[in-house]
């Protein structure tokens, strides 16, 4: 017999091997219709799991996040079941899921599929779900599983990687699939789902392999939740920087040029220059020296830094030179800044040395990860490396955190979290193997954040290979968590490059290195701001601040040119709409382009030597003298 304690405080004895569902039916009948899974001794289990030891049992219902994850996971298998009936001989590979949805990658072989097929696929899914099929898990040996999936080379490859682990196969009706995650125990709970989109994918993200099909979907326990989520997805789509850019033309992408290689168009380039000048000016005031360094380098420098060992898969292939040397497009700016420091002998009195650069880098992002400006293969990082003494670590780190917060205030960024990113101590391949160094750096990082009295989360496995870091995390419009700012403590690279400074006693010491970026890459930061402002940038950032609209080009253009000249001389970004279109069309166009101020020029404006303007999204028209309008714009420029 085993003793089971329920969450309501009840304790009962059961036969060893009694499953959770039996206990629910006997003692928790109110939970029977809404039960999805359970925690047993704090471990998530399925309702048909037999219990074989004493423990505490907690039933979770439709509202629990783990229930939604299990539902979406199980729905992905229901989709596979339907697809296997409609499209015989397909080869399922693998998928993923969370509380909001799922996807599965499938080799359809000779079959063609598009989103136009979704209705018929969903219909088949409903037909299967309504059969109320039990979903059963069974454990198999490696050899047995190989025989079952002998006709699916993708599954055989996955089995090969897990041959020494337990191999679970799930069955619903006559459909089976290899799976290690948890399921709900009957298809009757799968009622409210929607297939969302199709994209290309590669097995294990390897673009050298055959391109297969990825199908996305989402599933909920009731219709209202599904409908609400579909509305949210539509809102996210409309807030996605790629969608916003369709009307505003800040950047473009070209498959002919290459994947992940963006073009900055005129208006996007204007905003980028403003951001770059802003951050460079702040860094110069903060004691940084700004440099330019080569975008390619001898591969040996990345061997010295360790990037070649730990980052090779993210680097573009080497270029073979006639003299036998190998050059690579740099994936990081760090080694170049190490060489600048090494070019001179420093005294302890001269530290900190702060070297900053808007450094262009190239990274071979997987094709499936490339997205708009958010994930690209060519990027420019707001990068800096600070060389300090041990006694300067905390003071310098705190300055950087304050710098980040100041910049975020200016850009009106207020929804972010601090994350301390540590190594995974078991992963000796990914991280430099020096426990003492890692423990020291991680402890210092945590002490600093506690002293600053800032809330933070801690995660393992997200550190750089050479040291732990503070990441500032934001959410994109699509719900992806991205790093906007990063500060890293590094005891390793200065030693690998033999960097030193002369101490007070005349001896040579190795400096400590802080890597930091305040606004990420220009590409990622711009994509975030585009979503943050939904294309309507604050006045000081707007690529075009004022548009002049002459009612009649023959009669009003000269006065418009005069106003434009005055505004340009005062430092404002202004254009004249000289299209041969109606006034209402030009005003609609200005609204579409989200221009902060629209000035209409007609007979009255010329006669009284005034302007008539209105602001974006406002109907009120205001008349005033140009000098007063300039004072208004100057005050707007100061509102960061």
Swiss-Prot record:
Keyword vocabulary terms for this entry: Aminoacyl-tRNA synthetase, ATP-binding, Cytoplasm, Ligase, Metal-binding, Nucleotide-binding, Protein biosynthesis, RNA-binding, tRNA-binding, Zinc
Annotated compartments: Cytoplasm
Gene name of the record: thrS
Family to which the UniProt record says this protein belongs: Belongs to the class-II aminoacyl-tRNA synthetase family.
Residues that coordinate or bind Zn(2+): 334, 385, 515
Name this polypeptide is given: Threonine--tRNA ligase
Biological source species: Phytoplasma mali (strain AT)
GO biological process, one term: threonyl-tRNA aminoacylation
Domain TGS: start-end pairs: 1-61
Cofactor-binding details, from the entry: Binds 1 zinc ion per subunit.
An MF annotation (GO) of this entry: threonine-tRNA ligase activity
Record-annotated disulphide pairs: none
Function recorded in the entry: Catalyzes the attachment of threonine to tRNA(Thr) in a two-step reaction: L-threonine is first activated by ATP to form Thr-AMP and then transferred to the acceptor end of tRNA(Thr). Also edits incorrectly charged L-seryl-tRNA(Thr).
GO cellular-component term (any): cytoplasm
Oligomeric form and interacting partners: Homodimer.
Reactions it catalyzes: tRNA(Thr) + L-threonine + ATP = L-threonyl-tRNA(Thr) + AMP + diphosphate + H(+)
